[in-house]
UniProtKB/Swiss-Prot annotation:
Molecular function as annotated in GO: DNA-binding transcription factor activity, RNA polymerase II-specific; RNA polymerase II transcription regulatory region sequence-specific DNA binding; zinc ion binding
Compositional bias annotation for Polar residues: 124-134, 213-238
Alphabetical list of SMART domains matching this protein: GAL4
The protein, known as: Glucose starvation modulator protein 1
GO terms under cellular component: nucleus
Cystine bridges: none
InterPro entries: ERT1_acuK_gluconeogen_tf, PAS, PAS_13, Zn2-C6_fun-type_DNA-bd_sf, Zn2Cys6_DnaBD
Cellular compartments annotated: Nucleus
The keyword Flavoprotein is assigned to this record: no
Residue ranges: DNA binding: 20-48
Disordered: region residues: 56-134, 197-238
GO biological processes: cellular response to starvation
Amino acid sequence: MTKPLPLEVKRSRRPTSRACKFCHFKHLQCDATRPCKNCVKRNIGDSCEDIQRRKYGSNGTKKRAQSAQKVQSDSPSASSATNAGTSAVNESKLESSELPMVAQQTQQTPRGLETIPTIPHPNAENNSSFLSPTTSQMFNTGSNTLMDQLKMSVPENNSMYQHDTLFQPPKKYENNSYGYVNAAPQGQHMFYVGYSEPGEQRASPDAEKEPGTNLNSPSSYLSQYSHTQSHTNSQLTNSPSVVYESEIAKQEELQLTSFVEAANNEELDFFDMDFTQRPFIRLLENNTMVSSYPNNSTPKFFDHSRSHGRIPNTAKEVPTEIQQDEEFTPPLILRHIIKNPDDIYLTRVVKAYQYPKAYHALTKYLKTRFERTQLIEIAKCMSKYRPSFISATKSLVENDLIFTERSFQRSLLEYESLISMSAAPTIIWRRTGEIVALTNEFSVLTGYSRMSLLSKRTFIIELMDDESVVNYFKLFSSIAFGDLNATLLTNCVLRKAAQDDYLRCACVWTIKRDVFDIPMLIVGQFLPVLD
């Protein structure tokens, strides 16, 4: 460590304009002699030389300054701002005196939005007063062409954004008697219910004309809401420009409009309604069902599927003896063997699953059940995703297939423990449609025993009517390689174990994928739709 110098030595030294390298690095006071006293004292006088300083404005600094000046001179915004500076100041004085509210709104504009051009409303009359004469002339000449382009690109009912739909009802189901759950018009998302952002407030045109209206008060908000709803409903029903591409969407919109109009005309008190008169189904702890229908049954849905009643119900059949071969092991046997995660890796029962054999069995069942026109429609859906499954598994070795099957059985153990704590009737099946697990609530609701569904190769489509099967393949083909965490809300008609007995259900399908992003299993939860 350098000792402090005496006061006499400090006064005798004169500071120099350029230090040596050592003094500059050590932050010491250097002198004009070379070698300096600090270097001589440390026996490094041979290396004492002046530090080379970089000149100001040389190399990069000068080049950056020149490039910045060139960019400023080349930019049109700088030249236009310089030329129109005086006129903008004069116009701002006039605008601040005539339109103080506009000036306040301009000052509160968030950063990053100053460069976004504002398109004047085509119906506004006083928009020219907001702009300078040059800008006003530019908007007047170009606004017509721009608004025509916007009208061509945006539909007339532009309050609803168009999305790529995941659930579009086919034309075959337009006259379906039981319809779809949350079936949106074609071109809209299936979950669209007129959603708006949480922080967004939509007021009626009357509220815009009356600045003194307080939208935060309940009475004014309800009046504005009823006015907006009635105005929207009248536009939907009376506007001839609304074109429905689907009959189901049209009927749904008309029913919704009539319901809203009836609710606005008649003040209903929902707290005075007698909820005991509503239909219900209750599952007891002893695995029995109690409902409001005669003989504790479920509502009948047989009129729309008379052709399906002629096909024997193979799902309820229980084999006399469980047949086990090398290519297929019934899920009931696997459930008795695999009871904890260690059994998956220690037993030799878990092998590579034969998905081609499963698809062949599925094709054989479809040919015995459906007609040619329906088979062609199902085949088109299966052709969209079956080659992808084959190409994805073609490069996998035997150990990879064993690994995917072990992952399937491990995930199935977790899902079985999860659905056992849920009161919703739940059933799990493979991507081929083979049922692998179900809850007691599902057995009570449909009448199928665990023995009948898990002791043989049973497909989930055996529990559905014809129209629900076609709809199932259409939906599955659309999400097979879509969202990695796909959850689908739809409805279907389940075929119960009793003869000619059907049950309409709303269902939620959750798809679980393996490490190769291929659908591994589907968890379906069903709730009956009561009339």
